[in-house]
Design a protein with these regions (language model features):
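Helix-coil modules at protein/domain termini and other flexible surface or pore-lining loops
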Residues: 2-139
Length: 139
């Protein structure tokens, strides 16, 4: 699924492991990035600094390295982020800066309580950023 606007989506997922890779940077102009996720393993990967959105998507899927990887976020001239709650839900966010992308991903999830049984506190906790990636021309 590709998101080209400032939208975020909540995804059900397993534990997330992230990988980021930069692609061939453009001297000027529009740069694209993508984040891919595997539903079976929770692996996430990114690819940034591509002149073509399709190339960014293909690179993110390739770097993810799992058969069921799919692009969950496409961004242009900015940043993307993946957050995971203690309940294992995952959300993505996009923004012109890393901070804005991370905030959006966290805000989509909000605080979450750990699944039962949990040996620690059952109090809701904020989501953790597991991957962020920015194009070279991000703000």
């Amino acid at each position: 699924m590709s998101l080209v606007s400032k939208a975020a989506v909540v995804l059900a997922g397993a534990a997330v492991a992230g990988f980021g890779v930069a692609g061939p940077a453009s001297a000027a102009g529009t740069l694209h990035g993508a984040i891919a996720l595997s539903d079976s393993t929770g692996t996430v990967a990114s690819a940034v600094n591509y002149d073509d959105p399709g190339a960014a998507d293909a690179a993110a899927n390739s770097h993810c390295g799992v058969r069921d990887c799919r692009v969950v976020l496409h961004f242009t001239d900015g940043c993307g982020a993946v957050a995971q709650g203690v309940d294992r839900k995952v959300a993505v966010g996009w923004g012109p800066t890393q901070a804005e992308a991370e905030k959006q991903a966290r805000d989509v999830l909000g605080p979450s309580a750990p699944p039962f049984p949990d040996l620690g506190s059952a109090s809701p906790r904020p989501a953790t950023i597991v991957l962020h990636a920015c194009t070279a021309n991000a703000a």
